[in-house]
Each structure stands twice: as structure tokens, then as C-alpha cells.
């Protein structure tokens, strides 16, 4: 089995992005699952173009996109993506779409194709804080989650897919007093559990 796991490049003046720091630290194989890692640009449209190319070439059994949610303290298991870009800040190429539809022929929203409640149970067993989240925002994270689920539906693919938000890691909060964070090792462990739980349930 093949799992495509994506993370983002740093954005908004951050020097690192915990999503890619964790994804790039995953082993290349977990049990009998081949782990394929992909770094996405934090850029509207270019991010899904790179993702779609990889989906076509790799043909994975599961796709888990990971992004940064600074200020959250837990692993956020995103339930739904909405068909709108409404950026509060500029992306890494200066784009700032406001109230723009992502795909004109797409549904208003798509639900995660990951077993998010079961994942939460498994993470709780090993004392990793997690929660089901009902909003992935309207920046590039929601953009890529929606695009992934749109692609799966549009192409009638029988694969699992969804999005996970992760907190800042230790290196990012040295100048941010009282800001929630999680160690990179804990995020990596969480991703391993998410991958296995998603594929085996």
C-alpha cells in the first residue's frame, strides 16, 4: 500500500512549518505501507496543481495532507472543507483571494474520507491531545483539503483522504510566550497512528 503524506513550506514570516518538519521525519515505510512525502507550496492553486500531479503519478491508497494551525494545542482532525478561498493574509506569492470559489463545478463542501472519530480514540489511548475540528479555515489549508476531496470525487477514486492540522513545534514558540505547542516527535507519532488507523479501518 502507498500513502501520500503532504506538508507545507513555511509562511507568514515563520522559518519552519511543523507540518513539513513532521512529515519529512516519517520513516519511509510503516508496517507494509510505503510512505511518500510531498512538500507543497503555501500558494493558492500551485499547491493543488502539485498535489494533482503527484496523485496522477503515484496513485496512492491514501492521502493525508498536513498543515500548521498556530495557536491550537492539539492534533486537529478536520471534518469538512468548504468551496471558498477567503485569505486573511497573503500566500507566499502575494495572492490574497477574497470570497473566491475554488472549483466552480465542485460541491459547496466535502467531508473528510478519514475515520476521524476512530483516529481520535487511538490518539487518546497514547495520550496525544486531539480533537475533531469543524473548520479548516479559508486559507491554503482548506484550499488543499477541498482540492484533494474534489479530485477524489471528480475521478471516482476509491481512496481515503483528508486533512490534519498540527500545532506549532518547540522551535517556533521561543518568542511567543504562553503559546500552545507540541513536540515534533509527538506529531510524528500522531501521524504514524493516523496513517495506520486510516488504512486499517
Curated annotation (Swiss-Prot):
Domain of life of the native organism: Bacteria
MF GO annotations: pyroglutamyl-peptidase activity
Active site positions: 78, 141, 165
InterPro entries: Peptidase_C15 (IPR000816), Peptidase_C15-like (IPR016125), Peptidase_C15-like_sf (IPR036440), PGP-I_bact-type (IPR029762), PGPEP1_Cys_AS (IPR033694), PGPEP1_Glu_AS (IPR033693)
Enzyme class: hydrolase
Catalytic activity from the UniProt record: Release of an N-terminal pyroglutamyl group from a polypeptide, the second amino acid generally not being Pro
GO CC terms: cytosol
Complex and partners: Homotetramer.
Similarity comment text for this entry: Belongs to the peptidase C15 family.
Compartment list: Cytoplasm
Name this protein carries in UniProt: Pyrrolidone-carboxylate peptidase
Function: Removes 5-oxoproline from various penultimate amino acid residues except L-proline.
Matching Gene3D superfamilies: Peptidase C15, pyroglutamyl peptidase I-like (3.40.630.20)
Biological process annotations from GO: proteolysis
Enzyme Commission no: 3.4.19.3
Keyword terms of this UniProt record: Cytoplasm, Hydrolase, Protease, Thiol protease
Organism: Brachyspira hyodysenteriae (strain ATCC 49526 / WA1)
Stored PANTHER family: PROTEASE FAMILY C15 PYROGLUTAMYL-PEPTIDASE I-RELATED, PYROGLUTAMYL-PEPTIDASE I
Amino acid at each position: 500500500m502507498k500513502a501520500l503524506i503532504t506538508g507545507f513550506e513555511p509562511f507568514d514570516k515563520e522559518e519552519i512549518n511543523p507540518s513539513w518538519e513532521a512529515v519529512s521525519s516519517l520513516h519511509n515505510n510503516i508496517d507494509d505501507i510505503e510512505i511518500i512525502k510531498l512538500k507543497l507550496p503555501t500558494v493558492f492553486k500551485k499547491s493543488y496543481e502539485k498535489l494533482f500531479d503527484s496523485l496522477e503519478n503515484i496513485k496512492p491508497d491514501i492521502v493525508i495532507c498536513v498543515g500548521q494551525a498556530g495557536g491550537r494545542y492539539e492534533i486537529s482532525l478536520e471534518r469538512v472543507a468548504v468551496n471558498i478561498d477567503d485569505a486573511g493574509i497573503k500566500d507566499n506569492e502575494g495572492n490574497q483571494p477574497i470570497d473566491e470559489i475554488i472549483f466552480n463545478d465542485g460541491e459547496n463542501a466535502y467531508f473528510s474520507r478519514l475515520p476521524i472519530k476512530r483516529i481520535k480514540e487511538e490518539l487518546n489511548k497514547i495520550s496525544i491531545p486531539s480533537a475533531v475540528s469543524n473548520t479548516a479555515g479559508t486559507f491554503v489549508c482548506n484550499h488543499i483539503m477541498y482540492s484533494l476531496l474534489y479530485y477524489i470525487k471528480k475521478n471516482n477514486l476509491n481512496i481515503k483522504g483528508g486533512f490534519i492540522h498540527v500545532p506549532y513545534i518547540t522551535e517556533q514558540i521561543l518568542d511567543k510566550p504562553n503559546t500552545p505547542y507540541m513536540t515534533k516527535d509527538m506529531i510524528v507519532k500522531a501521524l504514524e497512528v493516523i496513517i495506520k488507523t486510516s488504512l486499517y479501518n
